[in-house]
């Protein structure tokens, strides 16, 4: 009985140790921070104090080929800057409000947040070396902009209403254009059919008159 209990304890210790090692390995491999609408401000404190350090954030879309191309360099950058600069990702297609807040117009957009200001990386090369130089000091040569506040409930509702109105107008314009096109086609088609029918009747009458005259001459 004691032997069985001892074996169980040893087995449990081995499993716990293995699970801990796997967890540590995964944490060590995962250097990128995944940000979303729920945790962005809490983790970055971009507009509320910036006590969590400097953040270098990539705003991307899954379908963007340039984003996929630079992914290995971005992951290497996160590993190289660990403990100095927080490197993170934001999938804008799943976090539309963050895209609106920071006015993301293209992918990838790289923004560095430092002490209440944000700096956009506009360098042509997206190598680990160039990105690292920017994150560790070269960003100061760029023009910084104040970090916009999180979108308020009023702003979200207003944007929803405006988007709804714009979509309704787009549908109306498309429907109106379709109606005009179909109406014009129907009118022209009807006109063409009418002309063909009139021509057919006129031709038929013209061919029947001589026959009637011929029959009358025979009667005389």
UniProtKB/Swiss-Prot annotation:
Signal sequence region: 1-19
Pfam families: Thioredoxin (PF00085)
Entries under PROSITE patterns matching the protein: THIOREDOXIN_2
Tree of life domain: Eukaryota
Lumenal compartment segments: 20-181
Keyword annotations: Disulfide bond, Endoplasmic reticulum, Membrane, Redox-active center, Signal, Transmembrane, Transmembrane helix
Motif Di-lysine motif: positions: 217-220
Membrane topology classification: Single-pass type I membrane protein
Chief localization: endoplasmic reticulum
GO biological process annotation, one example: response to endoplasmic reticulum stress
Family matches, as CDD domains: PDI_a_family
Membrane-traversing stretches: 182-202
GO-annotated molecular function: protein-disulfide reductase activity
Coiled coil: none
Cytoplasmic side: 203-220
Cellular localization per UniProt: Endoplasmic reticulum membrane
Gene Ontology CC: one annotated term: endoplasmic reticulum membrane
The Thioredoxin domain, residue ranges: 20-141
PANTHER family per record: PROTEIN DISULFIDE-ISOMERASE A6
Comment, domains: The di-lysine motif confers endoplasmic reticulum localization for type I membrane proteins.
Protein name according to UniProt: Thioredoxin domain-containing protein
Organism: Theileria parva (East coast fever infection agent)
């Amino acid at each position: 009985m004691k032997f069985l209990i001892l074996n169980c304890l040893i087995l449990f210790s081995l499993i716990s140790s293995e699970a801990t090692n796997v967890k540590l390995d995964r944490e060590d491999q995962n250097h990128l921070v995944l940000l979303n609408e729920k945790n962005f401000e809490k983790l970055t404190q971009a507009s509320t104090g910036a006590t969590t350090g400097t953040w270098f954030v990539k705003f991307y879309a899954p379908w963007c080929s340039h984003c996929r191309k630079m992914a290995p360099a971005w992951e290497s950058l996160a590993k190289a800057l660990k403990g100095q600069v927080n490197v993170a990702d934001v999938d804008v297609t799943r976090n539309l409000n963050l895209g609106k807040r920071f006015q993301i117009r293209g992918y990838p957009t790289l923004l560095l947040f430092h002490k209440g200001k944000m700096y956009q990386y506009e360098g042509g090369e997206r190598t680990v070396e160039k990105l690292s130089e920017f994150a560790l000091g070269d960003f100061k040569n760029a023009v910084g902009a104040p970090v916009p506040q999180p979108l308020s409930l009023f702003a979200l509702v207003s944007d929803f209403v405006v988007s709804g109105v714009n979509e309704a107008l787009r549908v109306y314009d498309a429907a109106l254009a379709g109606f005009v096109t179909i109406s014009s086609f129907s009118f022209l088609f009807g006109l063409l059919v009418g002309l063909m029918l009139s021509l057919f009747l006129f031709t038929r009458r013209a061919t029947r008159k001589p026959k009637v005259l011929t029959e009358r001459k025979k009667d005389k």
